[in-house]
Amino acid sequence: MVILENVYKVYNEGTQQAFEALRSINLHIAKGETVILSGVSGSGKSTLLSLIAALDKPSSGKIVVAGELISKLPDLHASEYRAKRIGVVFQHFNLLEDLSVEENVIVPLIHSGLSLSTIQEMAAKSMQRAAIGHKATQSVKELSGGEKQRCAIARALVHEPELILCDEPTANLDKANSLKFIEILEMLHTLGKTIIIATHDPLFEKLSFVGRVIHMEDGIIKT
């Protein structure tokens, strides 16, 4: 499902401020596998997620997702790749605060070419999965932190992505809401989704549905 071969990422390359964020990353993740990227802040796990999401490009190396080479995609094709294959749950939610929950959830489908009724059906299904359907018409700015996270999950799932990427998904949640989020992840795992979670929360490493914990330190995978 996800293959990284000899991936490097250098910021400010060719300058005195050059910083090697990732070095010699080789990683294969199977379809349907749930993987934890573990490490302290600055270890490279969020950078790695951004490359898999085609939000940034590697300095060198190859990244293949579901048979598609995504490491050198032009920006337009990268947007199409994200809209088709992946859902991303960000640490800070990245929601449109003045819109309702439903309006936020349908954002990934705006340019899909689907009918309004189909879009609404897909949004309703996704909100139900994320246990936020009862707040569909409520403004996002009125939600609690846990509710905002569930809205972000519903938005990430609305287009039925094959791959789900989560970047420090419980960093802004209390323990009760963190456990609710984990329940949703377990449900997605049973549906056969491929899930990659970047976190330093030790709670994730103990979950029965997690296939592997990959430890990162100073931009490399520790073995």
What are these regions (language model features)?
Residues 70-87, 190:
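ABC ATPase NBD coupling module
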Residues 53:
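Helix-to-loop junction immediately C-terminal to a conserved catalytic motif
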Residues 160:
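Conserved catalytic motifs of ABC-family nucleotide-binding domains
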Residues 139-143, 147:
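Conserved ABC ATPase signature
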Residues 164-167:
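Catalytic Walker B motif of ABC-type/P-loop ATPase nucleotide-binding domains
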Residues 99-107:
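Short coil-to-helix segment of the ABC ATPase nucleotide-binding domain corresponding to the Q-loop/switch region
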